[in-house]
Regions:
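Short, low-complexity N-terminal intrinsically disordered segments enriched in polar/charged residues
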Residues: 1-30, 46
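Intrinsic-disorder-associated interaction segments
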Residues: 6, 10, 14, 29, ...
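Short, well-ordered alpha-helical segments enriched in acidic and aromatic residues
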Residues: 32-50, 54
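Surface-exposed, charged secondary-structure patches
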Residues: 53-115
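Short beta-strand edge/turn micro-motifs at domain boundaries
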Residues: 102-147
Length: 147
């Protein structure tokens, strides 16, 4: 669990951040793997592809679609208690590297908090900088799901 002292800034959650966190839970449990892939931040996509290449090197039967599906299944297992949509925090927490965390509270007898990582990605559209929020499933030690 992430502690508040690990964050550089805590602010009120914006509508865009709230929607990104809710959308992540919704997309995570859909069957469409391409939709899951499309919400991941570029850093995580690169990490996944690098891990895939290393695994494929040692086992040529490993294929990318199945590899990504296995990762999604592992992430689904972590967030499974949120399928019925938990309550979303009113705050967003920023790391010193710019990654954001939105907390979702699970339901049940012993509810726990599930952090959803958001990464701002900047791109140029019609000669103007724009930003979109993408999901980050890895923590700073990129080998572990962000819990």
């Amino acid at each position: 669990m992430l502690k508040n002292e690990e964050f550089a800034l805590t602010k009120e959650l914006t509508k865009e951040q709230q929607e990104a966190a809710r959308n992540f839970i919704q997309v995570l449990f859909q069957e469409d793997l391409s939709e899951f892939w499309s919400i991941l931040c570029d850093i995580d996509k690169s990490r996944i592809y690098g891990l895939y290449e290393a695994n494929h090197y040692y086992d040529s039967d490993v294929e990318l679609h199945g590899f990504v599906q296995e990762i999604r299944d592992n992430v689904r297992a972590v967030y499974a208690p949120l399928q019925g949509q938990g309550g979303i925090s009113t705050k967003v927490r920023y790391t010193s590297e710019g990654k954001m965390y939105v907390y979702i509270l699970g339901s049940g007898e012993n509810p726990r908090v599930y952090p959803v990582g958001l990464m701002p990605e900047t791109y140029i559209e019609e000669e103007r900088f724009s930003q979109r929020l993408q999901i980050s499933i890895y923590n700073d030690e990129f080998r572990n799901v962000a819990l």
